[in-house]
Curated annotation (Swiss-Prot):
Signal peptide: none annotated. GO terms for cellular component: nucleoid. This is Single-stranded DNA-binding protein. Residues 123-132 have a biased composition (Gly residues). GO terms for biological process: DNA replication. The gene is ssb.
Length: 168
């Protein structure tokens, strides 16, 4: 939305994402990302951890289910979302205000890891995406060379063989 404060966080999940469902059946996952800056200490000549920033995050519907199935405690993630301030009252009657991130996109950081991504299948019918509250399992990629246009050697006569000139 216009005027929202967007933020991108790179950090580690402090615990496994918590999948819950609202009374209307919408999936929601809550998790915390710890982002710790690295600071160079000129006196010692080495890098040290700065003070960690802990941000509470939430993501909804199908994306929430994908997060719960894919990410675990300690995973390094990249999160993009909108900062939201929320006020509430504790059981003791104290007023509290928290700042949270409503997640738009999340994924594993591949800086120090690898990942195999499986596209989530869509059920038949219209709508796909955040509007549908149905749960879909990840589709298994066959991985066969016939299905992957990049998985085989170029055919004869294609660009890139020998001393050919580019086709443009």
């Amino acid at each position: 939305m216009a005027g929202d404060t967007t933020i991108t966080i790179v950090g580690n999940l402090t615990a496994d994402p918590e999948l819950r469902f609202t009374s209307s059946g919408a999936a929601v996952v809550n998790f915390t990302v710890a982002s710790t800056p690295r600071i160079y200490d000129r006196q010692s000549g080495e890098w040290k951890d700065g003070e960690a920033l802990f941000l509470r995050c939430n993501i909804w519907r199908e994306a929430a289910e994908n997060v719960a199935e894919s990410l675990t405690r300690g995973a390094r993630v990249i999160v993009t979302g909108r900062l939201k301030q929320r006020s509430f009252e504790t059981r003791e009657g104290e007023k509290r205000t928290v700042v949270e991130v409503e997640v738009d996109e999340i994924g594993p950081s591949l800086r120090y890891a690898t990942a195999k991504v499986n596209k989530a299948s869509r059920s038949g019918g219209g709508g796909g995406g955040f509007g549908s509250g149905s749960r879909q399992a990840p589709a298994q990629m066959s991985g066969g060379v016939g299905d992957d246009p990049w998985g085989s050697a170029p055919t004869s006569g294609s660009f890139g063989v020998g001393d050919e000139e580019p086709p443009f």
